[in-house]
Each structure stands twice: as C-alpha cells, then as structure tokens.
Amino acid sequence: MSAITARLPLGTSARVLTHGDFHPGNVLWHRGRISGVVDWSAARLDTRWYDLAYCRASVCVLLGPDIADRLAAAYSGIVGGTADELAVYDLMCVFSSRHYLAESLAADREQGHVPNHQMSLAHLDEHVRRALRRLDGTVS
C-alpha cells in the first residue's frame, strides 16, 4: 500500500468541484444524451481523477474493464492527464467497490438472490491488474 500512496500526486492536481458518488446510477438520460446528474450530497473540491476512477469502478463491475478503459480514454482525450494519476485513484476506488460487492453479495444471498458477483469480482481484479501495470509503466 505504501508503494501506491507514494505515487499519489498530492497537491499537484487542480481541485475541481467533484460529485463524490459519480456512477451510472446518478446520471439521467433523455433521448440518448445526458440530461442531468443527481445525488450531490457527497460533492466537494477534489481532483477530477477521483470522480472518473469512482465511475470507472462502477462501469467495470457492470460492463467490464474494456468499457471502463474506453471511458478513461474519452475523458482523458478531453481534459488531458497522466496514467499514473488515474491508476492510483483507480486502485483506491476499486478497493471500495470490492468491499461494497462483498456486502451486497451477503445481502443478496440472505434474500435468496444469486446475481453474478463472481463475474463482477473478476472484472475488478482485471481492473486492478491494469492499474498496477500502468503504475509500473508497462502499459500506457
């Protein structure tokens, strides 16, 4: 963990208004376009990479790491940035997502539901591997 936190770009990224809980469930759509974003109760000033990484973890669980990577490429193409910054925040958010999935799995089992959490966990594991490779410089 110290190797990861040593790479945190503390104080180097501009602070912007962030949502704090940005994921597909908080995005409203109308006729194929984003019409709004709801649930701003966790909003704060933070690095833009946190919201992107948080959303990528959710997208990864739902749709897989390739779609999460496409989201990052589209976003980075607009705002610029480095792989290191996003990789560190990806790791932070993925750990939170794994915890949430574990709690969700237990609750689902108690209610008799058997969703495909194993696939979601496999997606998150691949997301972690990709972030670690970016930090090691083996993937741009």
Segments (PLM) and residue ranges:
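Active-site-adjacent helix/loop segment of glycosyltransferases
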Residues: 84-91
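Short, well-structured alpha-helical segments
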Residues: 1-5, 72, 86
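Conserved acidic
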Residues: 14, 67, 85
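Active-site acidic catalytic loop and adjacent metal/ATP-binding pocket
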Residues: 4-50
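Short beta-strand segments
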Residues: 17-19, 38, 90, 96-99
